[in-house]
Design a protein with these regions (language model features):
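Flexible, low-complexity linker/hinge segments
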Residues: 1-4, 111, 119-142, 154-158
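Conserved AMP-binding/adenylate-forming core of the ANL superfamily
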Residues: 2, 11, 19-50, 55-64, ...
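Conserved AMP-binding A3 loop
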Residues: 31-33, 139-162
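Short amphipathic alpha-helical/adjacent loop interface patches that line ligand
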Residues: 39, 43, 81, 161
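Conserved S/T- and glycine-rich ATP-binding loop of Class I adenylate-forming
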Residues: 57, 74, 146-150
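Cytochrome P450 catalytic-core helices
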Residues: 62-72
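Short hydrophobic alpha-helices that are characteristic scaffold elements of the AMP-binding
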Residues: 72-77, 99
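Conserved ATP-dependent adenylate/AMP-binding module captured primarily in the ANL superfamily
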Residues: 82, 86-114, 125-126
Length: 162
């Protein structure tokens, strides 16, 4: 496989094996073709909500297909996912969003933040959004993780490498 950006990996595999299973998790599976279409529509929904290239997007979802869909949709916009535990108490989640200043929080109830747009777990993009491939975009950073805050306030660890 030639080197692919994170925003193109799904497109690459969907073009070669659209009907093969991409993710199988707890009895639910999606194919590469479905994964491609769903992440394209989700990326367009996130864009409509204000996500732009090089933004941080906090993802507070449990492990599973929806988590991967959110991360790849963010990468397709040339933005940077900032995954956090879906089980974090609100006070810790607020500290992390204050630190990262994301343009969107995925996995928090709508209106959970005064100044940040959020969408709940189970968010489904509108059917009007295209499932066609998006232009290739690559963020300056691959991911933004947070430290545990064991020496005080959590810190943001931004990485350009997997």
């Amino acid at each position: 496989m030639p080197v692919q950006s994170m925003s193109r990996i799904i497109s690459y595999w969907a073009a070669r094996q659209a009907d093969r299973v991409a993710i199988d998790h707890e009895g639910r599976a999606i194919t590469w073709g479905e994964f491609e279409e769903r992440t394209n529509r989700l990326a367009r929904a996130y864009s409509e909500l204000g996500v732009q290239p090089d933004d941080f997007v906090t993802i507070a979802l449990p492990n599973g297909i929806e988590f991967f869909e959110a991360c790849f949709a963010v990468w397709k916009l040339g933005a940077t996912p900032q995954p956090i535990s879906a089980k974090l108490p609100k006070s810790e989640r607020d500290q992390i969003t204050d630190l990262g200043k994301p343009s969107l929080v995925v996995g928090a109830e709508t209106g959970a933040f005064e100044q940040i747009v959020s969408v709940p777990q189970g968010f489904v993009p509108g059917e009007h959004l295209s499932a066609e491939p998006l232009p290739e975009l690559t963020a300056a950073s691959l991911k933004a993780m947070t430290s545990g805050g064991s020496t005080g306030r959590p810190k943001l660890i931004v990485s350009a490498q997997p």
